[in-house]
């Protein structure tokens, strides 16, 4: 099968999986399909192998560890090594602007800075000492965050918008999610660093994709390959088309073409996730609240606390106060002053 067909199939499967994960988290029908699929596989895969797989998955996703942090740095190192080893030198020979070529390195430095800050910054851990301060930050909506609820694990009163992270075993103020790639919770005090990290990572992948693609296109134009003809398997003379050009470039520069494919896919995935995170920031929602929002007033969820009403009410986000106020709350979190007082 042609490389281009395989790559497009791979791209379609990756994007389909990404979309299904996003939609499946909000769609009970897809969750049911995934659950039934898991049951089918449980009859096929030996029990000992199932236990081993579950143990590995539990370690990777339900305990704090540096596996994905190391994997992140290895992948980033491999991509930049290939860029430096081949693409940078070849682009210099084609007289690319040095500002253009050094941009991915500048983005890498900034990205590593925000990556480190996302990893090491306290996301807003709630303790006995700061419990009262956090209780005053956000208003309780009585739906998703009712008053006078205690965390059964930490034995602390739960401030509005907080959540207990089972991975880190702590309650986090304005909890968004636990990110395995930074081995840390994303909360009130490090969301700004996480968004900046995600933006620079997306920008570096997109910039590298553009530089590499422009290099390949310029190479094709300079060599006049696109003006040539070739004889196909049936002995017919054919004009060079896109499929042939991709095959030709893959045989000539396999590592560069593979890199282009990887960073293009990565740019789409990161770009989509970045847009989702920016939407949450603009509307003053967290990932946890977005996920729980549709179920807050669900009549089929009796475990959800809701006041008696004559007719069902729709969940309303009471924490959104306009675009600029919402963004200011993330990038200049009010809780930073509480942290200084505590010290």
UniProtKB/Swiss-Prot annotation:
The active site is at residue 179. A motif (Di-lysine motif) lies at residues 340-343. It is an enzyme of class 2 (transferase). It catalyses: L-cysteinyl-[protein] + hexadecanoyl-CoA = S-hexadecanoyl-L-cysteinyl-[protein] + CoA. It is a multi-pass membrane protein. This is Palmitoyltransferase ZDHHC4. The gene is ZDHHC4. It comes from Bos taurus. Its main location: endoplasmic reticulum. Keywords: Acyltransferase, Cell membrane, Endoplasmic reticulum, Golgi apparatus, Lipoprotein, Membrane, Palmitate, Transferase, Transmembrane, Transmembrane helix. InterPro entries: Palmitoyltrfase_DHHC, PFA4/ZDH16/20/ERF2-like. Palmitoyltransferase that could catalyze the addition of palmitate onto protein substrates including the D(2) dopamine receptor DRD2, GSK3B or MAVS. Mediates GSK3B palmitoylation to prevent its AKT1-mediated phosphorylation leading to activation of the STAT3 signaling pathway. Also catalyzes MAVS palmitoylation which promotes its stabilization and activation by inhibiting 'Lys-48'- but facilitating 'Lys-63'-linked ubiquitination. The chain crosses the membrane at residues 3-23, 68-88, 96-116, 197-217, 256-276.
């Amino acid at each position: 099968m042609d490389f281009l067909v395989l790559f497009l199939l791979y791209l379609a499967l990756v994007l389909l999986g990404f979309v299904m994960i996003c939609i499946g988290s909000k769609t009970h029908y897809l969750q049911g399909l995934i659950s039934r699929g898991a049951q089918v596989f449980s009859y096929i895969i030996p029990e000992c192998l199932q236990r081993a797989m579950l143990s590995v998955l539990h370690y990777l996703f339900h305990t704090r560890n540096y596996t994905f942090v190391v994997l992140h740095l290895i992948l980033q190192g491999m991509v930049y090594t290939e860029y430096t080893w081949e693409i940078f030198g070849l682009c210099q020979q084609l007289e690319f602007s040095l500002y253009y070529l050094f941009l991915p390195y500048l983005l890498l430095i900034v990205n590593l800075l925000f990556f480190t800050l996302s990893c090491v910054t306290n996301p807003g851990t709630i303790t006995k000492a700061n419990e009262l301060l956090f209780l005053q930050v956000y208003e309780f909506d009585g739906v998703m965050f009712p008053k006078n609820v205690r965390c059964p694990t930490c034995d602390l009163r739960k401030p509005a918008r907080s959540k207990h992270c089972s991975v880190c075993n702590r309650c986090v103020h304005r909890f968004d999610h636990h990110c395995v790639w930074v081995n840390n919770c994303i909360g009130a005090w490090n969301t700004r660093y996480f968004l900046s990290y995600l933006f620079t990572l997306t920008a570096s992948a997109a910039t590298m994709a553009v530089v590499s693609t422009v290099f390949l296109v310029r190479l094709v134009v300079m060599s006049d390959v696109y003006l040539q003809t070739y004889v196909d398997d049936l002995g017919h003379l054919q004009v060079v088309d896109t499929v042939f050009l991709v095959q030709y470039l893959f045989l000539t520069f396999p590592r560069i073409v593979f890199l282009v494919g990887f960073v293009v896919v990565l740019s789409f995935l990161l770009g989509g996730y970045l847009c989702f995170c920016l939407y949450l920031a603009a509307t003053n929602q967290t990932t946890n609240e977005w996920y729980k929002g549709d179920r807050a007033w669900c009549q089929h969820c009796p475990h959800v606390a809701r006041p008696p009403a004559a007719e069902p009410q729709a969940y309303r986000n009471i924490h959104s106060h306009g675009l600029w106020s919402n963004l200011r709350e993330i990038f200049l979190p009010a809780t930073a002053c509480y942290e200084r007082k505590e010290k």
